[in-house]
């Protein structure tokens, strides 16, 4: 029987543990701009997927996701040990890391909304002085 509430609680705790460990315990400078955004645990509590994003060194800089991915792959064993020490479960889930695409998708969605708003404004400006075709009130006797 799968306990989804327990899996959700464990995922939340794994997210907190991994984020804290990357910030305070893992001494890899390649992980400096990595942010843990979410974690998901399978129903059998044996596998956990940790989602992360990578920032650039500056606002305009492109993030180096390949370097961050390599650093996370190297630190996976150490992170699993830290998670196992802090979780009180019989079996420590295996950790896998996946780049979180939600920020890029939301930025694209925001761009689409801005484009639609601009088109609405252009249409509103175009129709401001427009008059209906035909009679003003076609139902007038």
Swiss-Prot record:
Q: What is its main location?
A: cytoplasm
Q: Where in the cell is it found?
A: Cytoplasm
| GO CC field | cytosol
Q: Which domain of life is it from?
A: Bacteria
Q: Which residues form the signal peptide?
A: none
Please give the Pfam families that the UniProt record associates with this protein.
RBFA (PF02033)
Which residue ranges are recorded for the region named Disordered? 120-141
Do the record's keywords include Cytoplasm? yes
Keyword Hydrolase found = no
Gene3D superfamilies of this UniProt entry?
A: 3.30.300.20
Q: How does it assemble?
A: Monomer. Binds 30S ribosomal subunits, but not 50S ribosomal subunits or 70S ribosomes.
Function, as annotated, reads: One of several proteins that assist in the late maturation steps of the functional core of the 30S ribosomal subunit. Associates with free 30S ribosomal subunits (but not with 30S subunits that are part of 70S ribosomes or polysomes). Required for efficient processing of 16S rRNA. May interact with the 5'-terminal helix region of 16S rRNA.
UniProt similarity note: Belongs to the RbfA family.
- Protein name stated in the entry: Ribosome-binding factor A
């Amino acid at each position: 029987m799968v306990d989804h509430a327990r899996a959700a609680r464990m995922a939340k705790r794994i997210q907190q543990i991994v984020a804290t460990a990357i910030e305070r315990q893992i001494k890899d400078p390649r992980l400096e701009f990595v942010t843990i955004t979410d974690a998901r645990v399978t129903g059998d509590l044996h596998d956990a997927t940790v989602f992360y994003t990578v920032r650039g060194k500056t606002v305009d800089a492109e993030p180096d996701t390949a370097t961050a991915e390599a650093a996370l792959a190297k630190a996976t064993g150490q992170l699993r040990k830290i998670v196992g020490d802090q979780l009180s479960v019989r079996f420590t889930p295996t950790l896998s890391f996946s780049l979180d695409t939600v920020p890029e998708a939301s930025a694209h969605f925001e761009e689409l909304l801005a484009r639609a708003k601009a088109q609405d404004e252009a249409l509103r400006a175009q129709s401001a002085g427009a008059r209906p075709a035909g009679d003003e009130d076609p139902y007038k006797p």
